[in-house]
Design a protein with these regions (language model features):
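Short beta-strand micro-motifs in enzyme catalytic cores
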Residues: 44, 113-115, 209
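Long, charged, glycine-rich C-terminal linkers/tails
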Residues: 102-115
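Electropositive, glycine-dotted interaction segments
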Residues: 1-96, 102-105
Length: 259
């Protein structure tokens, strides 16, 4: 499609499309395009807010996680009953990202739900319990990102987007966070936005997994990294994080899409 008109198609007959409407909606009536439409329509995008996660909430079914993570206590309660393995995976990564954390669970309080963390305390024989109000932004943000990555909606694992997952996290936790993202991507498509060189400081990241984003003249251009960046990757000259620090990420001019 270009300008709302079909240039080339695998189908003999197509519904009418216009330049000011998303063509995929019209095409979703065709069996061949329906899975694409369902997958994109089911995409979830999250930006967990520690402030929202601290507030006690009325209990909900916990399906799905809200964009700001405000109902995360209900989601954890759902996972405890319906998917204990997912709950364990979330806690394992949380322990690796936030040393000293033992577990997290939903806690009822006068008809409301909140989070309760079990954490090691120096000199104590066992872990202490802390409410969400006493836990750092970084811990809450890490929990929100992990639940967004692994929880899913019902039986589905739709594509998931997370905005700047590194916010409020210690730079040393970036490697574990990347491991969690890789793990989640084995089961669902994961899309991230990031400004963090620390998160991208890994030789396992390939140029085909990255999109460069630039603001040019009031428009946003998005595309795969340009030839200079790809050469640096191919020759193992720099990691993605090092290139980002040097402000060398540019979208390929021929394929950049403006918004």
């Amino acid at each position: 499609l270009r300008g709302g008109r079909a240039v080339r198609s695998s189908e003999n007959r197509l519904p009418r499309t216009t330049a000011d409407r998303l063509a995929l909606v019209a095409l979703s009536g065709l069996e061949e395009f329906r899975p694409v439409y369902d997958g994109l329509a089911g995409m979830e995008v999250f930006n967990p807010s520690p402030e929202a996660m601290r507030r006690p909430q009325a209990p909900t079914p916990g399906d799905p996680l809200r964009r700001d993570g405000s109902n995360i206590a209900s989601v954890l309660e759902r996972l405890r009953h319906s998917s204990p393995e997912t709950e364990r995976r979330v806690e394992e990564y949380l322990r690796a990202i936030v040393p000293g954390t033992r577990s997290v669970r939903s806690s009822a309080m006068s008809g409301w739900e909140t989070l309760e963390f079990q954490q090691d305390v120096s000199g104590s024989a066992g872990p202490w319990s802390f409410p969400a109000s006493a836990v750092s932004d970084g811990t809450l943000r890490a929990l929100g990102v992990l639940v967004a990555l692994f929880a899913g909606t019902g039986e589905a694992l739709s594509p998931v987007g997370v905005e700047e997952p590194e916010i409020a996290l210690h730079p040393a936790a970036a490697g574990v966070l990347l491991d969690a993202i890789r793990d989640a991507s084995e089961h669902r498509q994961v899309l991230l936005t990031t400004h963090s060189p620390d998160l991208l400081d890994s030789s396992t990241i390939l140029p085909g997994e990255l999109f460069a984003v630039r603001s040019v003249g009031g428009t946003t251009e998005v595309g795969h990294p340009d030839a200079a960046v790809r050469f640096a990757f191919d020759e193992s000259l720099f990691t993605a994080g090092e290139l980002l620090r040097a402000d060398q990420f540019q979208p390929e001019p021929e394929e950049a899409v403006s918004r």
